[in-house]
């Protein structure tokens, strides 16, 4: 234990003179001397009750002793027979336990988290014991309050603020709200009271028992002003009245306060669960809610003005960088995102701060600095209050109390303590300003050039001149003014509330300032105003862009780079949330993590709610697509990686859709009984084309076929028994339905299943044996070509191995070179006649001569031609790796393979970027001449010459 500092050793002599006789100096331990020197409250309490010191020395405070509070208090109240006795025992118990807590805190015997827990649970124990004693007494006097069914009605108490959060400070008011479940009357009393009268009278007595000062002090100062309608409202409300108030009249600050609300005592009873469920939608909105930030900023402004008005300097709670700002930071995230992130719904600050860090809403460094600062400030606050059991957060100005705090906080002197305090509060202030801002930063923000505000609010005419647009060409200037005027006209047709108008008037000058700084201002503004038209009636999204300048900047740069992204954001504004975090926006999910991410995402949605499941799948896909496109635009993803990500994303979707369809089918029909003898589901999805070849683009559809290995005689084992093969057919139909159903977030993917045996005329799902037989005996050469780019994208190991074996067998069949060459060439010529050359003086990157399809046909031809001799050629299904294999197996010269690979990736890269620009896949005739010449030469060499 750290020895007392010099000023405190001198003060000890004063303490000794005050001590009563039973507490002789020589009988006191070093610990007792330290605590008695530090705290006048402990000194006075132990002087009045010397036996408490004996108890402290023989049974030192423990971190977990809060678990005994209920039993200890029950024992203390066991002989209480009247209200006066109740008040006396509650006060003595509170004082005795507070001395134990002060002892543990002063000597740092337990962590600060434990101190907060003990203080909070002590208050809860005292409140609940007082309530229960009074409820029994009131029931004896007036009868038991009951509902219409005769069921007894309890008084439920909501602990608010730090009490609710389990973070009560040493000397604190307690904020309470009283409620009872249902209307009715008392039964069994001398005269009947309605429940409102019963609980109001009981509530008044409870406040008196806790709050009224006596010769033993008080238990807690009780503050009831957080209840609906404040001091002018009823003291106790029914659940129905509470619900009506919060739904119809609940204000932002009340929502803020309700985050920490906790039901005191038995929190798992039926009525407690009902009350909790009733309040949750008010506190945690289903959608991300950015109105919170302005509300909290307004509250912070009020507090800052109050601090200035009352001259509250050196206030560690309300001052800049103080405890309140840490609470605001945490609650911003809770109120904005708590409805969608259950981990943010904790009432306690530290667990919520951990969840914020885990969700990457704050950097690890910022979160850790806030955690350390919070614990430092809370310890300092509690030590300060425990000196005199006084509710204060203002640092002392006298030398004695400064010396006390420096010693207890483990600093050599007061300047060292204040230096550390300043560092912590500076860290808090920095994070607070970045997130919420204050009056000063708002003033700077509002000082944005008045000309931009005029440009927006006056909607200047086309022939007006404005200096802020002077740098643009005359055409662009006219176009910008027209776009602004048209946008304002469009707004007049929409129903936008006063809050929406206010946010828009704040947002637009900033947006115009940023957009018009660009050379492509007119084009970018046209895309963004089209997006804004779609969201102006949804203030939440406007607030997002208004409150987060970084999100606005990302929106502008992405819309400038890609009309496809602008269209996606306009169609699905939920995606705007992705703009908040540049770390994830430009960093797509790891290719092997899509399945896990999607699984986690779907856990938020009830498994049995098909509509929400479908919506969640589509929202996940769109968010991931946005990230991939953003990384593509930023140049952090090369073309091959773009396709890899799009393909992995599609596979994760297929996985989830099959899972959903399977669960639904099994619930309806049971499982096919042949699965009892084997692992897996006996089902596979084979991806062809771009999916099979790892070459998906942004708007690619999925070429799929479905396989099963169900015997002819298999049946399902459910109550509604059906033929096993019929089960797999319905499963495939269900999968197609889940992909193609149009929800408010669109469809998932266009799916084309025409590559199955016999095409559109064939069965939607095929047995593995029938597929093998068809490929061996009926398939055309072009179907074998398609098989080159096919692979299982979902399926159990048995079926996957079977398909791979069939594919390998078909591809390694010996083929007559000339015949194969002719068939492949003629098929390509038919395709070209059908698809290519539709745009005069343009080059169709995919379909025209020298384009992507020619390269694909070259690789397919060479695999089918030489796989009989070189089976390794069957290993991969994508063109780039097939070209590598052709070089490695001495079919094609390495230089040619590399040149074709470069041409192929260059052309595909262009297709990706055209898609981002929402442009068709053709370019000027004089583009890519070198690549086309190279491809033509290879075509001639392999598919024309003998």
Curated annotation (Swiss-Prot):
- Gene Ontology terms, MF aspect: [glutamate-ammonia-ligase] adenylyltransferase activity; [glutamine synthetase]-adenylyl-L-tyrosine phosphorylase activity; ATP binding; magnesium ion binding
Per its database record, what is this protein's job?
Involved in the regulation of glutamine synthetase GlnA, a key enzyme in the process to assimilate ammonia. When cellular nitrogen levels are high, the C-terminal adenylyl transferase (AT) inactivates GlnA by covalent transfer of an adenylyl group from ATP to specific tyrosine residue of GlnA, thus reducing its activity. Conversely, when nitrogen levels are low, the N-terminal adenylyl removase (AR) activates GlnA by removing the adenylyl group by phosphorolysis, increasing its activity.
**One GO CC annotation:** cytosol
Alphabetical list of CDD domains matching this protein: NT_GlnE_GlnD_like
The SS bond pairs are none
The name of this protein is Bifunctional glutamine synthetase adenylyltransferase/adenylyl-removing enzyme
Is Transmembrane there in the keyword field?
A: no
Q: Gene symbol?
A: glnE
Biological process terms from the Gene Ontology for this record are: regulation of glutamine family amino acid metabolic process
PANTHER family reported for this sequence: BIFUNCTIONAL GLUTAMINE SYNTHETASE ADENYLYLTRANSFERASE_ADENYLYL-REMOVING ENZYME (PTHR30621:SF0), GLUTAMINE SYNTHETASE ADENYLYLTRANSFERASE (PTHR30621)
Top-level taxon of the source organism: Bacteria
EC number of the protein: 2.7.7.89, 2.7.7.42
- Catalyzes what? [glutamine synthetase]-O(4)-(5'-adenylyl)-L-tyrosine + phosphate = [glutamine synthetase]-L-tyrosine + ADP; [glutamine synthetase]-L-tyrosine + ATP = [glutamine synthetase]-O(4)-(5'-adenylyl)-L-tyrosine + diphosphate
Needed cofactors: Mg(2+)
Q: Which UniProt keywords apply?
A: ATP-binding, Magnesium, Multifunctional enzyme, Nucleotide-binding, Nucleotidyltransferase, Transferase
> What organism does the record attribute this protein to?
Escherichia coli O7:K1 (strain IAI39 / ExPEC)
Q: Where is this region: Adenylyl transferase?
A: 449-946
